[in-house]
Regions:
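Cleavable N-terminal export/targeting peptides
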Residues: 1-19
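Intrinsically disordered, low-complexity boundary segments flanking structured domains
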Residues: 5-10, 34, 66-68
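Outer-membrane beta-barrel transmembrane domain signature
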Residues: 17, 29-30, 37-39, 64-173
C-alpha cells in the first residue's frame, strides 16, 4: 500500500496542472494522467500504469492533441493520440481517437468520454499481432477539480488482456 500511495503522489506531481485519475476494479488498479506541454495549443504527454492481479502489468506513454471538430458546432472535444503500450510479452504503437463531452442539461456537470486505439500487425511487436483498446467513462464533476466516474475498459493483443467495469476518481490541477 505504501508503494501504491508513493507512486500516486509521484505521478500526481509529474502531471501537475492537468489531471490524474485512479480506476479501481476487483482485479485491477489503473493510474492515468496527462500533462499539457504547449500553452498555446492543446498538446499533451500522457501515460498510465495498470496493475493486473491475474496477468502481467500494462503501461503506456504517448502524445495527444485535443480540440473542437472543425466545421461542427458540437458540445464535445475530440482528440487524436499516439501511444506506446507495453506488457511483459507484448508491445504496440497504436493510433487513437477520443471524445469528451459535458451534458449541460442537468444541474450538476455530467460527462461522458471515450477512446479507441488500434495498432495493426505492422505496429505490434513481440508476441502481439495487433492491439485494440476501447474505453468508455461517465461521471460527475461535483467540485471544480474533482470527479467521480464509472467506466468500461477492454484491452486486447492476440486475445483479451483486460475487460473490466471499474469505478474511479480524478483530479485536475
Amino acid at each position: 500500500m505504501k508503494k501504491l500511495l508513493l507512486s500516486f503522489l509521484i505521478v500526481g506531481s509529474l502531471f501537475a496542472e492537468n489531471f490524474v485519475n485512479l480506476q479501481i476494479s476487483n482485479e485491477t488498479l489503473m493510474l492515468e494522467g496527462q500533462y499539457k506541454v504547449s500553452f498555446q495549443e492543446p498538446f499533451y504527454v500522457r501515460g498510465g500504469y495498470l496493475i493486473n492481479s491475474e496477468k502481467s502489468n500494462f503501461a503506456y506513454v504517448g502524445i495527444k492533441s485535443e480540440g473542437q471538430m472543425i466545421g461542427a458546432d458540437l458540445p464535445a472535444k475530440f482528440s487524436l493520440f499516439l501511444d506506446y503500450v507495453k506488457t511483459k510479452n507484448n508491445s504496440a504503437i497504436p493510433v487513437g481517437i477520443g471524445i469528451n463531452s459535458y451534458l449541460n442539461e442537468f444541474s450538476i456537470p455530467l460527462f461522458i468520454r471515450g477512446e479507441m486505439a488500434y495498432a495493426p500487425k505492422i505496429l505490434s511487436f513481440e508476441e502481439a499481432n495487433k492491439f485494440l483498446k476501447l474505453k468508455v467513462e461517465s461521471g460527475v464533476r461535483f467540485i471544480e477539480n474533482g470527479e467521480v466516474f464509472v467506466g468500461y475498459r477492454n484491452i486486447s493483443f492476440k486475445k483479451v488482456y483486460n475487460s473490466v467495469f471499474y469505478g474511479g476518481v480524478g483530479f485536475s490541477f
